[in-house]
């Protein structure tokens, strides 16, 4: 709660799974209450779809529903489900250094570029 009171904006990473949508609804409700009482300038920087597996209907459904609700707040960059992303923290190394050529690392680099482009616009 303290972080939401102090923040200007929130980047919401969202696993492309059903229960994550419930957590997202709770977070949005909490943000609404914080905005109403303590931090009227709090906004959503963006929603980042993570752990996305395009081979599953659920992943596609969650991505579609989130895009319909949040529209342009959803980043175009999607972080795929990727083994190398899961391995990197166990070695204490950022994913972009652990395996810079992995799909996951490339996605995070693309996210950084997208965030910078949004801020410049």
PLM region spans:
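Short, charged/polar low-complexity linear motifs in solvent-exposed/disordered segments
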Residues: 38, 104, 114-115
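Conserved catalytic-core segment of NTP-binding enzymes
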Residues: 1-83
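C-terminal alpha-helix
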Residues: 110-121
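C-terminal boundary of histidine-terminating zinc-finger modules
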Residues: 88-110
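A general structural signal for short secondary-structure boundary/capping elements
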Residues: 38, 92-96, 121
